[in-house]
Amino acid sequence: MASTSRGEEKKKIKLKITKNKMITVFVIIAAVAVAYIYALYVPKPVYSVDYRGIILNFRVDLREANKIPVEPGPDQVYTELINPLVKNITIVYKPTGDPDEDKYYSLAAFEIAEKLKLGMLARTIYDVGIDAKPLSEFNRTDYVNLPGKIQHPLIAVIHPIYANQTRVFAAPGHVIYIEATSYEGFDLAIAKFLISALKIKF
């Protein structure tokens, strides 16, 4: 009788161990499957792209930047700048009077000019100059009625101090506005402008 009950206890213990092992194996397989599906289907951040053989590196995730609205649409930004009539592009800004805040303009102007130049080189466009000037160079104190031309479009970069929305706006009169109400939005809007201007795919 005692040996029979011991045998039954051993079977129960083995059965419990086997069930626990099966549950553990099942949990591990399920976790691996979930991780694989996540890695396969959840988009990863994009910080660099191969643009016609030239690597363009960005400071922000292009997937996030792509959510910034472009008015009336990305094609208007592209056709304004990638145009055989364009000879010069000027980045226009309104100084804040604070050197720390104005650093954002320097960073924005550098990123825009560098990426546009590289993008144009990739498209074999060699004769377009890009520079940056304060509004005072155009006898203006604000961004209204900027004198853009088809041969000389303007990119008006609006600091978060002055902006009341976050967007890229291709306005009539050959002026493209980049504006944002936050510093993060400012960086994203600049990236969205470049995505639109160069038709970057990722």
Residues of each region from the PLM?
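Secretory targeting signatures
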Residues: 1-50
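Long, folded non-catalytic interaction modules
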Residues: 54-202
